Amino acid sequence: MRYRTEGSEVVALHQVSLEVGAGEFVSLLGPSGCGKTTLLRIMADLQQPTSGVVKIAGKSPKEARLSQKYGIVFQSPVLYDWRTVKANITLPLEMMSIPKAERNRRADELLELVGLGNFSDRYPWQLSGGMQQRVAIARALAIRPEILLMDEPFSALDEFTRERLNEELLAIWKQIQSTVVFVTHSIPEAVFLSDRVFVLSPHPGRLSAVVDIPLPRPRTQSMRNDPEFFRLITEIRDRFEGV
């Protein structure tokens, strides 16, 4: 992936090759400027690669987008302040002309799933940052995607809220059984969430390591104190230092 800036060419991603299995939870991990968000945007058909091939459930990113194969959650919740929580969740279903009764049924199910069943009539500005991101996750799941793409969704939250939402996200993932591709620059977050961690290095962005995470599931906060958890963090950190 290349682009031009101020008269010079920048190589954002170079010879990146990876494969994610159905139902797998993987993280794209790396420092700022390593191309992890660019890679996610290519998967989401928000940016076009200058070379190479990308397949989403056997389809091109554009075909996957048009057939509602994936949902996406950004760093910012991107909610509409003039729409209620429930109306924000039903928005993609309205765009698909799903009948109102079905829209409401799905929204009610998702509100319960993300723990916001009592907040359906609230507005985004009445919610905390963590609650807003839960609404964004519910909206992404409204179309029942096979794949959930997440671009550092918890990076703006405090550490306590972030760790709690990590655990809640895994509970949601267990129920929906979608494939998740999660972008983060936090090593502990990647280890806690993932089946595998794809480590990207910068200048140009490239895949430098793939680390299996053999921690048992379900994962709980107590695992953050486990020696194996710290060993995996150290292993990944050593991979960065070796780049």
Describe every region a protein language model picked out.
Residues 52-62:
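Conserved ABC transporter NBD signature motif
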